[in-house]
A protein has these predicted regions:
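Nucleotide-activated donor-binding/catalytic signature segment of Leloir-type glycosyltransferases, i.e.
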Residues: 61, 68-93, 103
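Conserved donor-binding/catalytic core segment of Leloir-type glycosyltransferases
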Residues: 21-37, 43-47, 59
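A short helix/loop element that forms part of the nucleotide-sugar donor recognition site in Leloir-type
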Residues: 8-20
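Short beta-strand->alpha-helix junction loop in the catalytic core
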Residues: 1-6, 65
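Conserved acidic donor-binding segment of nucleotide-sugar-dependent glycosyltransferases
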Residues: 138, 147-149, 153-160, 168-170
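Short glycine/serine-rich donor-binding loops of glycosyltransferases
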Residues: 116-124, 142
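Short hydrophobic beta-strand element within catalytic cores of glycosyltransferases
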Residues: 124, 129, 133-136, 146
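Acidic donor-binding loop of glycosyltransferase active sites
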Residues: 99-117, 132
Length: 170
């Protein structure tokens, strides 16, 4: 389970202001920066998201071996004004950063012919407990953490159109 006393809706107005996101539709993604988590597809879907929501901003919280690749994707797609990398934060700060978002997204996907999948995806439950709708990838246990159409939407983590449409819908 999750600590619902820790992960609950919080006022992130000051954090959003500090990050320059007070007038943005913030898509927050929290997790280790690795291929399986689908952060690359989230970045690649941003142009489609921006067509529907020109004020959208992707806030990526976490660190990992995929950071350099993700930063290159941001540069290649001219998204530096629309994507922020926060890096590692303390556990105590997680709810405030999650609540800085309007929607939580981590379109995870399976790798290596299904041998590498997302586990339960507890971060989806934490985001839901914070009051955010979630977009999860259909990988491993992640779909089990989302009540389709109630707490969020499960998408094909490789389908940029599905990712963008789900985020626009929520």
């Amino acid at each position: 389970g999750i600590d619902v006393d820790h992960f609950s809706p919080q006022d992130s107005t000051q954090l959003r202001k500090h990050l320059g996101l007070e007038r943005k539709k913030v898509i927050v993604s929290v997790g280790r920066l690795v291929h399986r988590k689908g952060q690359d597809r989230l970045i690649e879907s941003m142009p489609k998201i921006l067509e529907k929501s020109p004020d959208a901003h992707l806030l990526m919280v976490g660190q990992g071996p995929y950071l350099e690749h993700l930063a290159k994707l941001v540069a290649i797609n001219n998204l530096s004004e629309h994507v922020s990398f926060i890096g590692r934060i303390q556990y105590a700060e997680l709810p405030e950063y999650i609540c800085a978002g309007d929607v939580f997204a981590m379109p995870s996907r399976s790798r290596l012919a299904g041998l590498e999948v997302e586990g339960l995806g507890i971060v989806y439950l934490e985001a839901s407990a914070c009051g955010l709708p979630v977009v999860a990838g259909a990988s491993g246990g992640a779909p089990d953490a989302v009540l389709q159409g109630v707490t969020g939407l499960v998408v094909d983590g490789n389908n940029l159109d599905e990712i963008a449409e789900a985020i626009a819908t929520l």
